[in-house]
Regions:
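Cytosolic-side membrane-entry/anchor segment at the start of a transmembrane helix
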Residues: 1-32
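Helix N-terminus capping/helix-initiation residues
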Residues: 44, 115-119
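Short membrane-interface loop/juxtamembrane segments of multi-pass integral membrane proteins
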Residues: 82-113
């Protein structure tokens, strides 16, 4: 896989993840509105349980989409590090991406714990 293909795959992954993130953020808002309506209208216990389950599922899925952002960056850094180790010439941007995203030849592991602090760190290195 070439450097351009790695960046293209990262771009596609981030675009798709952003769409899912926006959708789940909206559904999380809907869950919040549904909860407030259920509380204000003195809804039954079944409705409150259904709204709570819907809200928890929406929150989990939103967190999952945020976790895929980090995983996408780690996977791209891993692919660039493997490309570098294979002897291919990389651009200065690719080398700085490997450094900024802690790229290594070890395969990244998916984690459900997104790191918002690392997002700001990555954004600072983009400029």
């Amino acid at each position: 896989m070439s450097e351009v293909e790695i960046y293209s795959q990262l771009s596609n992954s981030l675009s798709t993840t952003a769409l899912f993130g926006i959708m789940w953020a909206f559904l999380l808002w809907v869950a919040g509105r549904s909860a407030s309506v259920a509380i204000e209208s003195d809804a039954g216990i079944v409705m409150k349980i259904a709204v709570t389950v819907f809200g928890l599922v929406s929150l989990f899925q939103f967190n999952l989409s945020a976790s895929y952002v980090r995983f996408g960056f780690e996977t791209a850094a891993h692919s660039l590090a493997v490309l570098k180790e294979s002897g291919a010439d990389l651009s200065a941007r690719a080398l700085s991406s490997i450094e900024a995203m802690n790229g290594s030849t070890d395969v990244p592991q998916f984690s459900l714990m997104p790191e918002p602090v690392s997002y700001t760190h990555l954004r600072a290195h983009e400029t």
